[in-house]
Amino acid sequence: MASGGVAPASGFIDKNASSVGVEKLPEEMNDMKIRDDKEMEAATIVDGNGTETGHIIVTTIGGKNGQPKQTISYMAERVVGHGSFGVVFQAKCLETGETVAIKKVLQDKRYKNRELQTMRLLDHPNVVSLKHCFFSTTEKDELYLNLVLEYVPETVSRVIRHYNKMNQRMPMIYVKLYSYQICRALAYIHNSIGVCHRDIKPQNLLVNPHTHQLKICDFGSAKVLVKGEPNISYICSRYYRAPELIFGATEYTTAIDIWSAGCVLGELLLGQPLFPGESGVDQLVEIIKVLGTPTREEIKCMNPNYTEFKFPQIKAHPWHKIFHKRMPPEAVDLVSRLLQYSPNLRSTALEALVHPFYDDVRDPNTRLPNGRFLPPLFNFKVNELKGVPAEMLVKLVPPHARKQCALFGSS
């Protein structure tokens, strides 16, 4: 674990290093449940909160297993996001010039940070990567965990807004690329890691506007779901909440992420949210207006406690009437497979990847609108393809990409 400090609020480090007042964290840190002895050392802290523009944060990494200790300094540049969790700011590494994002969250000293534990497990081209982390404190003696993450400049949310402002539809190739990469990331976190993200929404989908590579971020709500163990149902942001969550289910599955991905795909195609309710009841009404009243069987799949509840009988609205006339039928079909009332009837992320809607991105001749190559889509690692049936594998990895795919070797 990297240790960390924050330079004085003036924003500049005194060239005379000894003039910066540095104090050790209290001894209680050694007994904190957050730490595993092997992975953490007490952080070195300098006062200040570190997020103001020009503020410099100094951390050290290494120093384990004979590695040399290395000092890294970050200059805070601007706040790029905040919420109940804390703040995310853009910073520049002064030693390398690299831009990073630093997510700063208040840390309860009694517990391990679940987001940090999850981030350490993740290694995937469509998931934002953790570079390192360190602790810092404020004058009020509050402990903060700082996650240093790779910086990706755009979000799907802002890309959607951009096309809306221009009164244009998002080019279909971007809809395909973004939704494909969401499904690939979900297949990895669900199957290889066993984690449910629980907050898939356009704001948590980062995009490089030049390459159009997408990365899922914000694992603050993510959790390993254990069958038979209850979970909180008030999870996931409105518009993207699966109906079983609105019904208060506590034994849900990773299929809640699939519903959210279906909502995002619908929004990419429409330019606006599919189910824009302000409250749980409003959202349910919006869902029922499209999918129709759930059957008793579907309600049982979502939350068995509601089977006797009397819902107004509304007929399903055909999906093709929700989208414009020229919408490719494959797009409509995929949305309908992701947005099923019964969680077990929704496509899995892997099944979505082999859907005909993505045949275009598997074509070696497909290019971005500016003529550039598509981002890497088929560089699957062995753990991503573990247990995938042969007939699915053949669809998943097109012949031209098999050289870059671990499972096919050099064949």
Swiss-Prot record:
Tissue: Absent in leaves and petioles, very low levels are seen in the stems and roots while a moderate expression is seen in the nodes.
Keywords: ATP-binding, Kinase, Nucleotide-binding, Phosphoprotein, Serine/threonine-protein kinase, Transferase
Database matches in InterPro entries: GSK-3, Kinase-like_dom_sf, Prot_kinase_dom, Protein_kinase_ATP_BS, Ser/Thr_kinase_AS, STKc_GSK3
Gene Ontology CC annotations of this record: cytoplasm; nucleus
GO biological process, one term: cell differentiation
Residue numbers bearing the Phosphotyrosine modification: Y234
Name of the protein this chain belongs to: Glycogen synthase kinase-3 homolog MsK-3
Active-site residue list: D199
GO molecular function: ATP binding; protein serine kinase activity; protein serine/threonine kinase activity
SUPFAM superfamilies per the UniProt record, alphabetical: Protein kinase-like (PK-like)
Enzyme nomenclature, EC number: 2.7.11.1
